Every structure is written in C-alpha cells, then in structure tokens.
Amino acid sequence: MSGARLHTLLPELTTRQPVMVVGAAVIDVIADAYALPWRGCDIELKQQSVNVGGCALNIAVALKRLGIEAGNALPLGQGVWAEIIRNRMAKEGLISLIDNAEGDNGWCLALVEPDGERTFMSFSGVENQWNREWLARLTVAPGSLLYFSGYQLASPCGELLVEWLEELQDVTPFIDFGPRIGDIPDALLARIMACRPLVSLNRQEAEIAAERFALSAEITTLGKQWQEKFAAPLIVRLDKEGAWYFSNDASGCIPAFPTQVVDTIGAGDSHAG
C-alpha cells in the first residue's frame, strides 16, 4: 500500500476490535538545547512549552481524533501535575479508568537539539505505581488490542503488569518498548515475548533489539529472524523512510506520506495510535 493511499484511508478508520490503552499521562517540559549537557557543564535552555504528554496519553488522543473508541487506563493522582493532565484530558473528551490515586503524576524534561533529536529525563509519579486493586477495575473484553509502554514494563510495577497480561485470555498485546527495551530484565522480557505481542520499534530501538536478541541489524533480515524466534508481528519505524512490517504471512514497507511537522515530541506514540 502506498503512503498516499494510507493517508486517504485514515478518515475512514473504524473500531474493529476493543482497544485498551494501559500506560502513563505525564507533564512534558520541552526546551530547546544547543547541545546536550555534559558532565560539569552549565548550559542555558530555552523553554518551548509545558505540555501534557506521556506515551499512552499521546496514543489515547490520536485514537480519539481518528474516531477510534478506547478504554484508557492512565493513572491520575492528586496534585498540581495531575490536575493539569485531568483538565487536558477533559478538553479532548477523555477520561481515565484509574483516577484520584494517592500522589501526583510524573513529569519529563525533553531537550530538543537543533536537528530535532529529542533527549528525555523522566521523574516518576503515580503512573508507575500500578497495583492489583487498579488492575481489578479494568474489564478487558475478549479480542481486545491492549497497549503497553516500555516505560511501565521497565518500572518496578513491570512484573505485576506482565503477570496480569499472562492471566488475560484472547487479547493481542501491542507493545511500544521505546528506549526502555534495553532496561527490561531478561527473564521478564522473555515472558513478555512469550505472549506474542505486536511490537513497534524505531530505528534506534531496532538496533538495540538486534543486539540484545543476537539478530541481524539489517531490517529485512531482522524481521525474518524475529518471526523465526518469536512468531510475533513486528513494526520498524524508519522516520521519513516509512515503516516496515513483518508477520508470519506478510511483510513490506509502507512509505511515509508528506505532512507538515508541528513538532517531533510524541511522533512514535502517534504512529502507534
């Protein structure tokens, strides 16, 4: 399918299976940096904005704007950051299934270099404090597509989330590991992959995955070896070059379609959405 054809199909998307988004809503403090900080330095940043973000929230917003209904399990706390997030979600017509948790939501400092490359420094909040009581509130319908972020899977609550995933029947996990793919313990990562999730990786994450799983760094070979090893679908996002997809019965590359770049924060999340 061409990128142009895909672009024309976006307004016609409909919900074909239940969707639940499990993850984080946080505050992004975005600043321009002429260079990344080095040890002992003192550099001046130019603040762009203070935005509501988080991988799961970006996906929830993208789905809502595409007309795709989803259950959103994005823990909201009781604090300044949480209230800002709650108000933003309300403006987007979104509610969270996990609300009024004890504590505040986390925040992230995003440094944007002149070429658009992003570097993140994160401070955790209630979004990484999942517990059994929260999970018991979630009703996951059979056949659901269930999104997880690597940020939560690599956090102290990752073990609990994977246990919950293993208990569910007839669901398709969609996992965007993000940069945390290198931080998840081997044993836990093996259990995640045993659930045969649909995994989405960007260019850098694919390189990390190839090294970690002893696979080829060449994209098409990586996709083939991934199928042989995990029997699970894989998406590799190559920014302006489009995205490769691999499954047991098909593979190919979808070219990117031209668009006006507003900013690069949340680009991968929007693609997942």
Label every PLM stretch briefly:
Residues 110-156:
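Conserved phosphate-binding/catalytic loop of the ribokinase/pfkB sugar-kinase fold
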Residues 164, 169-174, 178-252:
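Conserved phosphate/ATP/ADP-binding segment of small-molecule kinases
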Residues 61, 107-111, 119, 242-246:
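Short beta-strand scaffold segments in enzyme catalytic cores
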